[in-house]
Amino acid sequence: MYRRTTLWFLLLFQPILVFAQNRTELYECKIGTVNPLASTSLNACFKLYNTPKSFQAARRYCVSLGGQLADKINKDDSSLYSANADLEVANSTKFWVGASNLKCNIAWENGGEIEFNDMWAPESRYYGVAIDKMSIGGLWHTVPVGQKLPFVCTFQGKSNEAGPAPVHAMRAPAKKRVPKVEKPEEKDIDESLNAALSDKKEKKEVASDKKKESKKDEEDINESMNAALSDERKKSASLASSDKKESSKKDESSDEANLSASQVANAEMSASISASSANSSSDESSDEAYDSAEIEMRKKIGKTVIAMKSQEMASQSDDYDKYTEEDLLSAAASLIGGYILNAHWADSRTTNTSSFDSQTDEETLNMMMAIAEQIAMTMRSSKRRESSSSNTDSESASISESSQASEQAVMAAAMSAKSSKKSESSSKDESEDSASLNLEQKASAAASAALASKSKSDSSDQSKDQKSANVALAVVSENKHPTKKPEDPKSTKTTTEEPDIDESLNAALANQRSTTTKNSDLTTIITTVKPNALPIAIVAKQSEKDPACPAEWTQFNTNATAPALCFKRYEKPMNFEDARLFCVGKGGHLASIHNERQLLLLSALLHNNGPDALSDQTWIGLNRIHQKYYVYEDETAMDFTRWLPGAPNINDCTVFTGNELPNYPHKGTQYKFGDFPCEEVQKSVLCEVTLGKDKLKSQTTCQDGWSYYSHDGTAKNGKCYKRIDQSKKFSEAREVCKVENSYVASVQNEGEARFVSALVQTEKNYTVDEQTWIGYVKYDRDFGWEDGNKGLQFDPWTEKMPRQKKCTVFTGNEIHENCRSQFRFVSVDCNKTQRSVLCSKPPMKNGTPFVYKDTDNSSKKI
């Protein structure tokens, strides 16, 4: 019985005994005995604990002792803690303090931002703050909260005369004694108040009387002044009227004489003007016919010269490939508006050079451009008819030969007319000038006939075309040498190889962006003659938008109106000066970073999880080599920074970091600015191309309005992205992207997520039903992508957000002030309307855009 009672007693009261043995006694510290810097009740005293604990465990332990992890530490307290840690912390180099990002961004546990908040990367999750011992610098770090470290607790102080209740270290100041003043009786107050009011009333009455008297005096003065002024006006008016009558009588006779003289002069002048206008009208009529023929001739010659020069450059020049259609367009405009306009016009106007002025020059050029536009439309319609008709191979060959014959006939006629004009320009006779005019008209008519036969080649045979070409040559030869037979058209190719044509074309290509025309909508026909083939007519118009980024450059479009940004990272070790020259050689400059969007974009370019991730940093254009302040290489100001802790120091050049830097005393060094010696070699360089000034003429990767990114730098894994701001359900979002020959976007890795973050970022926070659709869908049992890609290479889901729905959105900013929901995936109902759609598609191949085709996933019903 005794044993049973003892057993029951032990079973019932053992938990109480264990609790009593393990109960932690509250730590009591007296004011000033431990912490000489104690100025507040929070940090009245502190104690370092050498037992390593995780961040949460250390926080709970301090609370159990009646204190907290060291909170709101200033620089002086930090130094004191670090110095004591050298004495009390044996087996570790750092200790926990009471700050972390468990709630959101790095902040003190009891609220308030940290003074050195730029030290930590905001995207790092589950990090606490730890401080080094003084012997190794006393620096601050962000450390994963699961790591076990010593820690420091702070407590409210207790008085030396402490009783059962704790007393704060700092007492409130005692109130000063105020001597008691006797209150006056109510009767005395009323009497004094009435007396004051009566005095005030009397003063007001006196002031109003004085004001009335002064106003009356002022009115009397004004009346007397007005009377005096009216008398003066009457006197002056009477004097003026008498003078006017006398002067009018004297001038009447002289006016009559002057009128008769002026009428005679006007009659003579009108007669002379009418005579001169009659003479000028006759001259202008002849000049108008002359100008029309000359314009037609110049157009033919310019077209032929460009065709020959294109053929010559294609066959002989090693640098021909670098010239694009825009180059030839600019060259054509320069040739028609420069060489031909000046040389041929001056040759034909030797007898009347006075009319060759800038106004005629511009009018003629505009007429030429209008004619070129009409011919371009004719050739396009002819080309459509030819493509729709089912001609045989023999007919195609016939068209090809007739086209070549027509072109050669035009060339021969033009050059014969030119040589004839040069031989006749030495004579100033009217008869020679009219003969030259007839010759040009005949040559122009022959050339027009040849071109007409070319445009109607689908209804005429080869013999007729050859005959018309021979007729054109015969007309020219008969005027020059009546007894000479026409030359073989094939031999006319080399007759126009003149140095002035070469110089003109080279000058036009060298200055390809400064055209001589003023017409912004210039359309020029450039015909390239190839053996045994139809002439290729290229109708090139000046682009109204900025050119797209060069091939394989990351292209970033923020919206439809802002210009695109073009960046590319080159894995080439070099110092800052070599990096600067390298980017200049690529047609751009070292990259500039001016806002959070660009920071996100470039962090995607530098994102690296490979073995060399710790040394992943690159040169950017920020430097102070030539001045005392920082400025970018493109001469833009430093208006946005994310410096590393302790930076900038004494170095003049800047790198942009990728992942954490090795051998750096702080954590949280991702995607920051760091000042480094300019002569130090960095592993890569980040270049930026300014649109419209790039020298790279490779084919673009994405169409206008799309942004390009490749997580590994290869076109194989590259994608073109575009955000479309239309409120749609998911099924409607599919159709929106399909119209753009794309799919609802796939975001498969951390690099793409960072890049897309910059695209979907907004100026304000939205709810979960106001986000951006992406193409991650739960089709049957598993998730997949609309474009057929499979899998995820990172964990994109938002914490404490649903994942069981079938469709997915990508968040821009925070949802309901949840900082962990920024730039993450959220599972949502497919039938809910979202704010925008993100589309993606493969990049262009050889300049050809991607064409939409259904995948196994995109064809499934949701």
From Swiss-Prot:
Residue span(s) of domain C-type lectin: 41-154, 562-687, 716-828
Which residue stretches does the UniProt record annotate as biased composition, category Low complexity?
265-283, 388-418
SUPFAM superfamilies (alphabetical): C-type lectin-like (SSF56436)
Give the keywords, sorted. Disulfide bond, Glycoprotein, Lectin, Repeat, Secreted, Signal
Q: Where is this region: Disordered?
A: 162-291, 377-437, 450-469, 474-504
Annotated signal sequence is 1-20
Task: Quote the Pfam families the UniProt record gives.
Answer: Lectin_C
Please name every pair of cysteines joined by a disulfide bond in this record. Answer: C62-C153, C653-C678, C807-C819
UniProt-annotated location(s): Secreted
| GO terms of molecular function | carbohydrate binding; signaling receptor activity
User: What InterPro entries does the record tag this protein with?
Assistant: C-type_lectin-like, C-type_lectin-like/link_sf, C-type_lectin/snaclec_domain, CTDL_fold
Xref: PROSITE patterns: C_TYPE_LECTIN_2
Query: What's the protein here called?
Result: C-type lectin domain-containing protein 161
The organism that produces this protein has a lineage beginning with: Eukaryota, Metazoa, Ecdysozoa, Nematoda, Chromadorea
**Gene name of the encoded protein:** clec-161
